[in-house]
Design a protein with these regions (language model features):
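Conserved short alpha-helical segments that host acidic/polar catalytic motifs at enzyme active sites
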Residues: 1-198
Length: 198
């Protein structure tokens, strides 16, 4: 992959890390190239791997109460940390966080861009326009999107072209959403096993 990132939204904080040189999803197992912390995160840590203890209400093992999104990137533009998901931005309502699979282009008045990644056009719809209602007039291409709204609530959407699969782990009230069905099965199995479920 050409980058990996994740974001966690809990009742107390929103936390994010981004990496290059993705290795495997088991224990995340990545080499950190840089760290991006959202302003309300609890503290900054630079180290190899992921340490959920830094988040206070998220234990190092077991289930945490919150939403988690992750994205493994296959670059359609420059491979660099700024183009690695999740993308974050702020407007009058608060902070938006999104990950996107697909390829989109922008049609309309120019909006501010910080990267060369097409996903930023989708984020701008939430920040500067009318969210997904703006896609029809301003976005061409295909997209599957997962993110957090300013209230920290998870949202998932896709158009009629982008693949998106979902599994639900009843005992954890946990949804797993992936654009690849095999990834969805593997991640679901990993979460079930890690939490001692069958």
């Amino acid at each position: 992959k050409d980058g990996f990132g994740y974001s966690i939204s809990t009742s107390k904080t929103r936390y994010q890390e981004r990496y290059l040189d993705y290795r495997s999803c088991k224990g995340i197992g990545v080499k950190k190239a840089t760290l991006s912390i959202v302003p309300d995160a609890l503290r900054f840590q630079e180290k190899e791997g992921v340490d959920f203890d830094t988040l206070g209400d998220i234990p190092a093992k077991g289930v945490f109460k919150g939403n988690f999104i992750a994205h493994g990137r296959t670059a359609t533009c420059k491979k660099e940390i700024t183009n690695t998901h999740p993308f974050n931005g702020f407007n009058k309502d608060g902070q938006w966080t999104i990950c996107h699979n697909g390829v989109v282009s922008w049609k309309g008045d120019a909006l501010p861009l910080q990267t060369t990644c097409d996903s930023e056009h989708l984020l701008n719809c939430f920040l500067h326009l009318n969210g997904e209602q703006s896609f029809k007039d301003h976005i061409a291409g295909y997209a599957a999107i997962i993110g957090f709204n300013p209230q920290g609530e998870l949202f998932v959407m896709r158009d009629n072209k982008a693949p998106l699969y979902c599994s639900w782990i009843k005992e954890l009230n946990c949804f797993v959403n992936c654009t690849d069905i095999d990834h969805c099965k593997k991640i679901t199995d990993y979460i079930v096993t890690a939490n001692g479920l069958k």
